[in-house]
Every structure is written in structure tokens, then in C-alpha cells.
């Protein structure tokens, strides 16, 4: 599913391009990012191009590259597993560079995505899954208004270590 560009005060959400693949291949191979995001294997530029051209252009998802207002790539976000009959979807966001975190980019991106999910796509529920050891992400989503609704105990395994997988959600009426 393709979508127009969305502009905020600090971020631009735009269609993903093959040129973005180098940024993602670089960051998505960092062990900390792989752990926090649940990536089970490294990626490279060619794999990311395939994701951009195939997997990120399906009828049940909409993906964006996040850029700052000057157009520099800082991450990606998407609504995936959109199920209009049930009015629910999952949300994902990755801003991998620590220098770009805690600057309001993630908060604005999530708000733009939730506005789109609830208002444009008429979703009633938006879910997100978080690696339990990623406590910064858990606090971030709580601050936005997501509520924890379940725990998949030891549902995530990375590099010889188990972690719980935390299921969170926000409803239209809470937004």
C-alpha cells in the first residue's frame, strides 16, 4: 500500500526508496539494534532493497522512511498486519542512531502514525510488541499512551539470552 508524504514539525514520513537501504543496512547490523528490534540475522543493502520493493509494498501495510526536516534519513516506521475488518493494526518504529534519539523525532512520528491509523484507516486498535529488556522503549510507549496488555514469557531469544516479549496497545478512545 503506497501513501503520500506526511510532514510534521520535526520529521517527514516519505515513501521508502532504494537509496535508503544503505542507511538501514548499516544500522540494522549493530548488535544493540538487532537485539532491541528483534532482528535474528544481519542484513545487507540488497536484502533491504528487496524488503523496500517487495515486503514493504503489500496491501496490508504502509511503510515510511523517517527523515528530519532537512531530509536526512533517521529511521523507518510502518503500520503492518492491517486488518480493516477488525479495525486493528500493528505499528513499528525504528530510530537506530543514538544521536537522533530523545530529540522528539520518535514522539512526533508515533503521533503522525496514530493519527493516520485512527483517522484515515479508521482503526480502533493499534498494537506494538517490545522486547522486555528494552526498558527505554517500554517507557517511551507508555508515555505516548500505550498500555501493556500481555507478556509472552521468554518469547524472545537473542544471542543466548531469553527475554519476555511485551504486548502493548492503544485504542482510538484513548487517543
Please give the residue ranges for each predicted region.
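Conserved acetyl-CoA-binding loop-helix of GNAT-fold acetyltransferases
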Residues: 102-116, 139-143
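Acetyl-CoA-dependent GNAT
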Residues: 41-99, 171-174
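Glycine-rich acetyl-CoA-binding "A-motif" of GNAT/NAT acetyltransferases
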Residues: 72-75, 136, 162
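Conserved beta-strand-loop-alpha-helix junction that forms the acyl-donor binding cleft
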Residues: 128-138, 155-159
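A short, well-structured alpha-helix characteristic of acyl/acetyltransferase catalytic modules
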Residues: 1-50, 174
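Terminal substrate-recognition subdomain of acyl/acetyltransferases
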Residues: 1-2, 161-175
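Conserved active-site tyrosine of GNAT-family acetyltransferases
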Residues: 141, 146, 168
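Conserved GNAT acetyl-CoA-binding A-motif
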Residues: 119-129
Amino acid at each position: 500500500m503506497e501513501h503520500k508524504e506526511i510532514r510534521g514539525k520535526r520529521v517527514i514520513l516519505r515513501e521508502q526508496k532504494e537509496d535508503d537501504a544503505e542507511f538501514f543496512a548499516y544500522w540494522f547490523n549493530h548488535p544493540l539494534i538487532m537485539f532491541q528490534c528483534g532482528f535474528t540475522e544481519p542484513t545487507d543493502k540488497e536484502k533491504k532493497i528487496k524488503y523496500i520493493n517487495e515486503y514493504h509494498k503489500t496491501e496490508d501495510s504502509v511503510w515510511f522512511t523517517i527523515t528530519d526536516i532537512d531530509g536526512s534519513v533517521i529511521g523507518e516506521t510502518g503500520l503492518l498486519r492491517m486488518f480493516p475488518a477488525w479495525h486493528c493494526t500493528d505499528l513499528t518504529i525504528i530510530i537506530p542512531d543514538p544521536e537522533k534519539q530523545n530529540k522528539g523525532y520518535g514522539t512526533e512520528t508515533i503521533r503522525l502514525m496514530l493519527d493516520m491509523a485512527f483517522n484515515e484507516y479508521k482503526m480502533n486498535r493499534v498494537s506494538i510488541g517490545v522486547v522486555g529488556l528494552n526498558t527505554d522503549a517500554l517507557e517511551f510507549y507508555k508515555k505516548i499512551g500505550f498500555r501493556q496488555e500481555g507478556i509472552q514469557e521468554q518469547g524472545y531469544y537473542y544471542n543466548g539470552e531469553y527475554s519476555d516479549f511485551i504486548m502493548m496497545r492503544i485504542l482510538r478512545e484513548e487517543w
